[in-house]
Structure formats: C-alpha cells, structure tokens
Amino acid sequence: YDGLDGIEDGIVSNIYAARANRDNFLKQITEKYGLTKAQLKTIDVYENGYTLDYAMANGMNAYHGYSALEGGAMDLGPDPVPREPLDTTYNVHHGDRADGVFKYFITKDPNWVLIDHDYYHPDQELYDMLMAASEEYDANSPEFDDFIANNGKLIYFAGWNDMSMSPWQLIQQYRGYVEKYGQEKVDSFCKFYVMPGVTHTKGIAMNYLSWLDVWCSTGEYPTETLYATMSATGGQMPMAEFPGWVKYEGGDPMDGASYSISTEIPDGFWGVYD
C-alpha cells in the first residue's frame, strides 16, 4: 500500500486505494500466517465495525471500524485469557477502559464482568441501562445551532491510523453536519482534516491553534497552504481537507511543496468500503 500515494516512505496516504484492495491483502496474510476463523472475525470487527439490532437513544446502531488493514496497528495483548478486571497490559487495548465504563458509568456495579454479557442481544435490564447511559453521555449530536449563532469555529481532525477513535466514524459524524446544515454552511464554521500516519494524538505536529486564532480573530480562515510535520519522516506534508489525501508529486520528500492534495477516489468507494 505504501507506494499507492507516489512514494514509499512508511506512510500510507492513499487510504482509499488501500482500502479498496484490502481483500487481497487479507488473503495474503491469511495464507502467510494461517489465520483462524476466530482471528479473522476479530480483524473483521476492527476493520468493518459492528451493527446492533437496536439503536442507542440518539438513533445510532452501528460503529464504523478502523483502518486495521490499511496501516493501523491492533494491540490485542499477549494473554488470550481475559482478566478480571480487564488489564490492557495483558488483554486487548482499551479493554480496561471499556470495563471501567461499564462498571462505573453504565451499570454502576463494580462487580460487573464485561465479558459475561451479550451486548448484541441484551436482556431487558442491560438494555435499559444502555439506553439510559446513551442518553446521558451522548456526544454525537449534529446540533450546532448555538455554536453557529455565537460565531464558533471548529477544526475537526482525524488520523487515518487512529485505532482508538475510528476516522470512519468521525467521517460519518461530519456527514451528519453536512446533511443537517449543507456543505456551504458547514464550511463556514468547520474545517475537517484527515491525515495519514497519524494514530491517537501521535504522528503529527501542526499549528492548528494559530490557524484557529486567525479564523476567530479575523473571520477568515488562512488561505495559504497549511503544512504539518510528520513524525514518521520528520518532513512536511500539506494538510488534507476531507475527502482529500496527500499525494507525492516529485521532488524533495521532506518538503511539503512536493505534495498535492488529491481527491482521486476509486469508483463506487462510498457505501462499500466506508
């Protein structure tokens, strides 16, 4: 996948082409490592997410997967036996956080054993607790009327390799803003960037506070090309505003001017691979 963006530099920038070829990659690693059905099922959840037969209080019933087959690093832990309480040192990454959320936020029961329950088919007690928690802690509302009325400005950001907060889920949320307000209105208060080689808060250095300050102070977003420094190479890349991706055009790969923002996306991508 690395060369699909024009340069092999350890950063998968053309995430769309990579994702469209993921089945071939999955076949290769399955044959190479002899992946079991259980392992493939786990990869499928990481890559494609999951859908519930019921909806949360806000109407959501699905969570999009990550870029697990396009450069994302999955940490499933060295211990195949879940501990109680779950321990990220030995069990799946973020397992202890999910365990704590259920123990202390959702069920209010410190003796709750996370893996002892079926969340796809919850009993009435668990269902009621999920509904109550989803209403109390919901942070997915596309409602920005007050924010817009007060001239609020938002730089919305996702990393393609973030395995803690799915970039595809954030894209879905951004689309909710566009569906509600229209693209022109959203552009007036929100700039959405998705960058390659970026995990959860790591992989990039960018001066977004200065950009936001200019926008809020002058009412105009910076018009010049904005660059970020990539941790993987130490070089610069231009900020890719969604749905664009960073394409190498030639020249010094450390120089941000050697790249462009491409909107070339495989035909039929949306609705199939997102």
Feature map (PLM): residue ranges:
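C-terminal His-loop and adjacent cap/lid subdomain of alpha/beta-hydrolase
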Residues: 1-274
